[in-house]
Every structure is written in structure tokens, then in C-alpha cells.
Amino acid sequence: YGGFMTSEKSQTPLVTLFKNAIIKNAHKKGQ
């Protein structure tokens, strides 16, 4: 269980960056 928590913590920033990239891409398409 401890390993799962560690992997989840390291995975969260990647998900945030991925979402930010999608939002930026959507803004570029909007313009």
C-alpha cells in the first residue's frame, strides 16, 4: 500500500502537466 501511495504522488504532477498542456493546446486552437 505504501508503494501505491508513493507512485500516486509522483503521478499527480504528470497528470497536472498533461492537463495544462491540453488546456494550452485548446487555447491555441481557439485563437
Curated annotation (Swiss-Prot):
The keyword Secreted applies. Keywords: Endorphin, Secreted. One of its GO terms (molecular function) is G protein-coupled receptor binding. Signal peptide: none annotated. One of its GO terms (cellular component) is extracellular space. It is found in: Secreted. It holds the Pfam family Op_neuropeptide. SMART domains: Op_neuropeptide (SM01365). InterPro entries: Opioid_neuropept, POMC-derived_peptides. One of its GO terms (biological process) is regulation of corticosterone secretion. It comes from the Eukaryota. PANTHER family: PRO-OPIOMELANOCORTIN (PTHR11416:SF7). Beta-endorphin and Met-enkephalin are endogenous opiates. Belongs to the POMC family. This is Beta-endorphin. It comes from Camelus dromedarius. The gene is POMC.
